[in-house]
Amino acid sequence: MEKVLIWFCGTGTTKQDFLANVEISGFSAIVAIDGIGTAAMLTKTQALAKRANWGGSFVDMSETLGVLYDQVNGYDDRAGVVTLDSLFPLVDYLKTLKEYQLVVGGHSRGAAVGLTEFLAELYHLAVQNQAPGVWANAKTIRLVVVDPVQGQQDADKDTNAFNAILKDKTLAQILAELETKWFGGREVFDTLVYSARYDARSSFAFDSRWYRFITEQMGKQAGPAKRAKLVMAGFRHSAPVSKEDEISALYQGKGVAPIAFLQQLVSFDPNWEQSARLLSQIENGYLDQLAAGAKTDLISQLDKQTSLLSTALPALSAANRCKKRCRRITRKNRNTAGSTAISTGRRRFNASYQVTSD
């Protein structure tokens, strides 16, 4: 069966960056959409329309300033239109397929905004009683939602302001109603939320819409949310998609690593749950050592590369934070699926839900 991938890149990440870091194979079609805060996206949004405010028009006089402005402020309506317009050529291709497996994934703002807006647009069409068209031929739609950090988009805490995303509809409701209206109740959506295990930056918290999905809907509400899973790997926000942030030395000879794990999730590898548990064992072991003050080369590298200093912010080492918090990360249901409370150094999920990594 043909496999098709749609990927929404994170802030400052081009489709070339993504494909260079995460090797994707086995797909008949791949559409990777440039992230906000890239020259590629800026060129497309400028061609569509000028910014609505004077300050935005001023920064667009320089590509460098325009890119930086977008990295700080995130998606605007123009970027939303460009993102969705990028999918039209794919729709023409899907018309040629009788059946296919679809993966829709994204990282950071690409997950929090791009992927979410895509789902909301499908929902918007469904509630207007429009036919599903080519989407009806999807046997499975796997959502791979990687660290959906929204970055305080325009001072908002979530994605409610974006096109077709209704304030009174949760993600669980959107997915459930799509399955009912477009797929006759068939279990189509397979949702995997992939969180970085740790990031020292408090501003890199989950988008509140996805946070509520994890803590209030996942494993509890009927439909796709009941089947959804949370997995965790990596010690930096971009570890699942960036070789630079993966800290690959930690995983050398282990048979698993955050990027390779993402490849498994995207490619429908049936062994992904085994890899999730192994990553949990490996990373929780490092956190135990870090909390205990171990002085090995690997622990020193982990401490250095997870400190705020490594992100060009005032220094606050992961060791100092972990001495207070790592014990809570590692002591409960660390290797098996089940009900747990997870503290990650930047955010905490206090709820009962199914996880496969801790």
From Swiss-Prot:
A GO term, aspect molecular function: hydrolase activity
Gene Ontology CC annotations of this record: extracellular region
Regions annotated as coiled coil: none
Tree of life domain: Bacteria
Claim: Methyltransferase is one of the keywords in the record: no
Localization annotation: Secreted
Class of enzymatic activity (EC top level): hydrolase
GO biological process: lipid catabolic process
The keyword Lipid metabolism is assigned to this record: yes
Name of the protein: Extracellular phospholipase C
Species whose genome carries this gene: Dickeya chrysanthemi
